[in-house]
Amino acid sequence: MNIWIRGGTSDANNISKEIKRNFKDSFLILTTTTDFGGKIAENFADLVISEKMTYDNLKKTLLDKKIDVFIDATHPFATHASETGIKISKELNIPYIRYERPSEKFKNAFYVENYEEAAKLALKISKKNIFYMSGIKNLKNVSEIIPIEKLIVRILPTSVPEALKILPSKNIVAMQGVFSENLNKELIIDYNCDVIITKDSGKSGGLYEKVSGATLAGAKPIIIKRPEINYPLKFEKIVEIVNYLKNV
């Protein structure tokens, strides 16, 4: 069985590990969008492709590799990747499986639909600084709403050059996560923040530690909801994927 796993997440690596354990003769191709993710993925797959693939390139590769099953284990907010995977799988008549990391609701958090709404709400309820913990991608948009002097951001070290175009270095925390509850708490306190902005990235994205750390620091968590996508087939447990593959 030739299996394509679209990843770049720890979820994808864990899925690959379990598939190889249960299906010794399977051929696993795991994709990531960065070389860093690719190096990690090499431990779990037969072939790793570390590049952003165009629609046509992805379609051709799926055909060339004679893929039997397409597993989407991308980040919950990687909507374009998921929608592309669904469309191509349908065109090629390849079974599509979505692994969706479980979501958890927090009673003390504010939930919003998008980054603009999050930034506006944060500005409204904050009397101190605002800690943005949702990556580099939407930082520019958020910085156009929240005054730069109030905005603290935590990003990957590789994103620092881009962040410096938006914020001064004293407002940038460059670290590779996932982070503990205590570290989150201490950072929020040290940077004098009373609100955090994050997204519903689930347990493997460190959401619980962010929210609990914020609560201990006396800060209000604002969580951006996951986008809604109509997946053809979705599982929240890796064992469910393994069981499905046994019947393919």
UniProtKB/Swiss-Prot annotation:
Keywords on record: Cobalamin biosynthesis, NAD, Oxidoreductase
Family matches, as InterPro entries: Precorrin-6x_reduct (IPR003723)
Coiled-coil blocks: none
Name of the top EC class for this enzyme: oxidoreductase
Membrane spanning residue stretches: none
Pfam families tied to this protein: CbiJ
Function: Catalyzes the reduction of the macrocycle of cobalt-precorrin-6A to cobalt-precorrin-6B.
Reactions it catalyzes: Co-precorrin-6B + NAD(+) = Co-precorrin-6A + NADH + H(+)
Protein name: Cobalt-precorrin-6A reductase
GO terms classed as biological process: cobalamin biosynthetic process
